[in-house]
Amino acid sequence: MEKTNEKYKAYIQILKEELVPAMGCTEPIALAYAAAKAREVLGCLPDAVEIGASGSIIKNVKSVIVPNTNHLKGIPAAAAAGIIAGKVEKELEVIAEVSEEETVRMAEFLKTVPISVEHIDQGVTFDIIVVVKKGDSYAKVRIANYHTNIVLVEKDEEKLLDIPVEGETEEGLTDRSLLNMEDIWDFINSVDVADIREVIGRQVEYNTAIADEGLKGDYGANIGSVLLETYGDDVRTRAKARAAAGSDARMNGCELPVIINAGSGNQGMTCSLPVLEYAREFQCGEEKMYRALALSNLTAIHQKTGIGRLSAYCGAVSAGAAAGAGIAYLCGGGYEEVIHTVVNALAIVSGMVCDGAKASCAAKIAASVDAGILGYNMFLRGQQFYAGDGIVTKGVEATISNIGRLGKDGMKETNEEIIKMMIND
């Protein structure tokens, strides 16, 4: 693929748009971002807060610890953090810098200011509305479809920004429908590594740091440490353990940032950390490692384009399959090995549900990475799943399309039932 090719430029831009830093689980951070923006527009601390959130937002915020809040959980905590300490210009790092005094003020704010939460359904899976009030004055902010996409800013009946939300589109982002496995393969083999060094290099640095912390500290169910203590430290176990350890830390209050993928820190770690571990094991060199990471990241984004940002379909599954693709490439695999790895992995663990962001995400990540590695080893030994084996159909693109259909359409009712269970808990 030539540098002058429009797809080459688009793939570089997609990586830059998707591989961005975020501090804390991205759904509560998006809520904190909306709250910080609303407070900025209001111009003072509010004396009442009203929050509307779609079911998938409620699901992903309910059980996860919001960083820099002294281990608070839930929607009110995320909103309070944004209102008290949020720096709007930092977007998904909106509460990365919080003083001890601000943490104390958050707790006091939660005790003294009424914060209402309403489940809203406006036909958009990703939907957040924050209204902050002071006396007769108010400010309102809406985020829709992706984490930093502010579509409405209103103060005292005056609309300062009003972008129509027409279904689940991602206006302003590079067209993800340009992605396909054949072109991704062409791109990663021809890309000038200098064009991706900064964006991929930051992922290596950030995600390695949080995996290290997850293995050193005591976070959640410590899945990463359990894997190493139980199964030893061969490269396959380390690949699973380090991805899980990053999630252990991230889901349970660690204040280190990660580089996300498809709007998710867990997916960003899942499609990068196993690949890094294999690259180090086989001493592949920086250039091959960067190409493998470009492959795994773009493969993950490609799958999520059909599934959507939030779904009842666990995003670790698509990221684990993508990690398998990157590992296959590092181990000397060609295009056939890569695409069969993806299909095999999807056949193994597709259907694992997302029941929100919380400690058990780390174990789901480990299972998904295991499926990615198994999918590759199957094909190495002449084994594979064929068209007609469940949701597997002829060709990698057709199978990925089926996964998108399953995640976006087929699991809608599953998502609704999970949300009902969590709201009524």
What spans do the regions from the language model cover?
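Hydrophobic alpha-helical bundle architecture
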Residues: 38-41, 67, 278-291, 301-367, ...
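Flexible, glycine/charged-enriched surface loops at secondary-structure junctions
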Residues: 45-49, 90-95, 117-118, 194-200, ...
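Signature of multi-pass transmembrane helix bundles
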Residues: 110-253, 419-425
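Acidic-glycine-rich active-site phosphate/pyrophosphate-binding loop
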Residues: 1-12, 45-59, 234-253, 285-303, ...
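A structural signal for small-residue-enriched, beta-sheet-centric alpha/beta enzyme cores
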Residues: 2-3, 22-26, 53-60, 64-67, ...
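Early transmembrane hairpin of solute transport permeases
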Residues: 29-128, 132
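Conserved phosphate/anionic-ligand binding catalytic regions in large, soluble enzymes, centered on
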Residues: 21-37, 256-273, 314-319
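Membrane-embedded translocation segments of transport machinery
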Residues: 233, 237, 250-284
